[in-house]
Amino acid sequence: MERKFNDQELIRREKLKNLQEANQDPYEIEKVSRTMTIGDFNSKFAKLKTHNTNNNIKLAGRVVALRQTFGVIRDFYGDTQFYLNKKKVSKSMLEYFNKVLDLGDIVEIFGSPFRTQKGELTLDVKKIKIVSKALKPLPEKWHGLEDEELRARHRYVDLIVNKDSMKVFVDRIRILKIIRQFMDSQNYLEVETPVLHPILGGANARPFITFHNTLERNFYLRIATELPLKKLIVGGFDKVYEIGRIFRNEGMDSTHNPEFTSMEVYAAYENMEYMMRLTENLFKYVAKSLKKPVVKMGENEIYLTQKFRRIHMVDFIKQETGVDFWEVKSNQEAQELAKKHNVKFEKHQSTLGHIINLFFEEFCEAKCIQPTFVYGHPIDVSPLSKKDYKNPGFTKRFELFINTKEYANAFAELNDPIDQYERFEAQVKEKSLGNDEAVEMDMDFIEALEYGLPPTAGLGVGIDRMIMLFTEKSSIRDVLLFPHMKDKK
């Protein structure tokens, strides 16, 4: 396929050709022996006042600025200025700087540190060599709303030119470490479970399907890690968690990506209230570790170290609408209330439990600005949750909402194999009525429960949304290194 290059790209390719013909091919270089990183250079000579000719330093990085005989070089750890003194360097070196070097080139520079008249730490360069030629120029402008898609599509360029973007992803790594530190401090073991599942389960979502050639059957990319983790509790593990990729063949928006990271947590012999405390303590631990007790999301300031609000779903609906679902006993009555309040429902959502959940989504979610635990979800929308024996029709389940978005979902796990079998059957019926997200019958999981699952509490946390919260980003694209994108038109 023939490629077309613009004028700048053609000039850079010509410079590369000249280097190669002069036996200076930068791509032949395998290793650069740096004296130190640029970050270490800036730290070591932070108090330097005069020219230190006794220190001969070799630095390496990308050229991100050029002006006359000055330049700026950048590596992962920082930026520093460099300078070629016309009176000191050879004519050939000066010509190399002026006629061969381009913005974006990766170079090694050798020289000694000094301070300019303006007081800026600078490397007085004796020798400069390109170790990787940039054949594409860096963009001149790389900011503003119009560039958001471009930045996500070409993340490598975004990372080169946008320090703020690099910081977000370094923060992401740091937050993941902090989460693991917290889980380790609570005596949890991190485990790994399969990504390919033979049966769809663990969440209500549409899957990606792939074909296993050897086994001659379809598999699903996991939509949750719940069922295999609960099997580990059956097997005798006490406290486990998994941080990993989840795949859901659904839409994309500011808080959804088809491939995302979640953490699921399971603890034997614990209940919903324990998991609620653990969730609150996790968010507070991360907030304190990052020294961010308050984060700003849009116009809202979120207070993460204050006590999280707790409210039952039915009480919340009554508070916002005046409708008291504690007094509603039939599907027909619920449907009439839905029509009266313009709450639309599909055929598979015509039960009392589904309509309660729809009322919550319609009238209550938007009111959850500060961290709020909403608990007591209907059985109809909670096929894996233990029922609330004091309130038939409801479960021991909660969701954590912050700034109107769900951040965590947890419950006392259903460990009654007979009840679980019946709920799977109900899900199969829902699928036949058009609910593409209903789970399938999983007899292997039923058999695992029949061996005995102790009373268990479980939790799922959306890691990407959590990172959005602590980095104060409004789009999931901004916290994913390589988000899924529509094809270029």
Curated annotation (Swiss-Prot):
Cellular component GO terms held in the UniProt record: cytosol
Any GO MF annotation of the entry: ATP binding
Catalytic function, reaction form: tRNA(Lys) + L-lysine + ATP = L-lysyl-tRNA(Lys) + AMP + diphosphate
Localization (cell): Cytoplasm
InterPro entries: Aa-tRNA-synt_II, aa-tRNA-synth_II, aa-tRNA-synth_II/BPL/LPL, Lys-tRNA-ligase_II, Lys-tRNA-ligase_II_N, Lys-tRNA-synth_II_C, NA-bd_OB-fold, NA-bd_OB_tRNA
Similarity comment: family membership: Belongs to the class-II aminoacyl-tRNA synthetase family.
Protein name in the entry: Lysine--tRNA ligase
Organism: Malacoplasma penetrans (strain HF-2) (Mycoplasma penetrans)
